[in-house]
UniProtKB/Swiss-Prot annotation:
Pfam family, one: THDPS_N_2
Residues bound to substrate: 107, 144
Keyword Protein biosynthesis: no
Family stated for the protein in its record: Belongs to the transferase hexapeptide repeat family.
Enzymatic reactions: (S)-2,3,4,5-tetrahydrodipicolinate + succinyl-CoA + H2O = (S)-2-succinylamino-6-oxoheptanedioate + CoA
EC number(s) recorded for this UniProt protein: 2.3.1.117
Domain of life (superkingdom): Bacteria
Record-linked InterPro entries: DapD_Trfase_Hexpep_rpt_fam (IPR005664), Hexapep (IPR001451), Hexapep_transf_CS (IPR018357), THP_succinylTrfase_dom1 (IPR023180), THP_succinylTrfase_N_sf (IPR037133), Trimer_LpxA-like_sf (IPR011004)
Entry keyword set: Acyltransferase, Amino-acid biosynthesis, Cytoplasm, Diaminopimelate biosynthesis, Lysine biosynthesis, Repeat, Transferase
Protein name: 2,3,4,5-tetrahydropyridine-2,6-dicarboxylate N-succinyltransferase
Entry-linked Gene3D superfamilies: Hexapeptide repeat proteins, Tetrahydrodipicolinate-N-succinyltransferase, N-terminal domain
Gene for this chain: dapD
GO CC terms, sorted: cytoplasm
Pathway annotation: Amino-acid biosynthesis; L-lysine biosynthesis via DAP pathway; LL-2,6-diaminopimelate from (S)-tetrahydrodipicolinate (succinylase route): step 1/3
Length: 275
């Protein structure tokens, strides 16, 4: 009885130090490629939603992404004739035809880059931006200019990633889980979300909010402090909290209120841009 791709990848992971493009067995290559194709098509995901803020990480899928770098040599890659790249991972759109783009139903504005093994949902828009391997970008989401979606990050439906936003990846430094931005979130310009932080549905981050696992997320109404998670429907701005000794303040993300009609009017997506 043949092994499943998951069991092959789990075994290969334990022996990863000995893998190389020259020595990798065919079954490992086949299993890794099957995962990358599934990620590319959106049929396999690094993490799956169980409830609001509750996600199950498929660690074996993340391992397959990491193993793929052990199985390929760098090689020249064309870029429309204006330059070349030298890498292990080809563009998602390397062999796309007009029919493929039409079937995908998304827009890709030059010079946006998405690597093979990432998924882009229907009616999504990629302005000049970067989507890394393993990432998932949901339907109707806007990835604005110079925004980056890190490896294996999970971006929900109808999300707006504003200009210069950085969504962290899992590859280096290796993270236990991906950054997750749930449906209908708005991430303000130049904000950074890293280290597997979860932004729950309908949340709004203002411009310049930085959140990692050690960042205090302070709710000014309740006094509660969260780590690694922004509760659903929160409106978050950059701020600071005083130290215990009162001699200095440290950066914190401050929940100032819950999303209301006024907030939604300011952050609504423009359907005209999704056609």
């Amino acid at each position: 009885m043949s092994q499943s791709p998951q069991s092959i990848i789990e075994q290969a992971w334990e022996n990863r130090a000995n893998l190389s493009p020259e020595s990798a067995p065919a079954d490992i290559r086949s299993a890794v490629n099957a995962v990358l194709e599934g990620l590319n098509a959106g049929t396999i995901r690094v993490a799956e939603r169980r409830d609001v803020g509750k996600w199950e990480v498929n660690q074996w899928v993340k391992k397959a992404v990491l193993l793929s770098f052990r199985l390929e040599d760098n090689k020249p890659m064309g870029a429309g004739g204006y330059t070349q790249f030298y890498d292990k991972v080809p563009s998602k759109f390397e062999n796309y035809t007009a029919a493929d783009f039409a079937a995908g139903g998304f827009r890709v504005v030059p010079p946006a880059v998405a690597r093979r093994g990432s998924f882009i949902g229907k009616n999504a828009v990629l302005m000049p931006s970067y989507v890394n391997i393993g990432a998932y970008v949901g339907e109707g989401t806007m990835v604005d200019t110079w925004a980056t979606v890190g490896s294996c990050a999970q971006i929900g439906k109808n999300v707006h990633l504003s200009g210069g936003v950085g969504i962290g990846g899992v590859l280096e430094p290796i993270q236990a889980g991906p950054v997750i931005i749930e449906d209908n979130c708005f991430i303000g310009a130049r904000s950074e979300v890293v280290e597997g932080v979860v932004i729950e549905e309908n949340a709004v981050l203002s411009m310049g909010v930085y959140i990692g696992q050690s960042t205090k997320i302070y709710d000014r109404e309740t006094g509660e402090v969260h780590y690694g998670r922004v509760p659903a429907g929160s409106v978050v701005v950059p701020g600071s909290l005083p130290s215990a000794c009162g001699k200095y303040s440290l950066y914190a993300a401050i929940i100032v209120k819950k999303v209301d009609a006024q907030t939604r009017a300011k952050t609504a997506i423009n359907e005209l841009l999704r056609d």
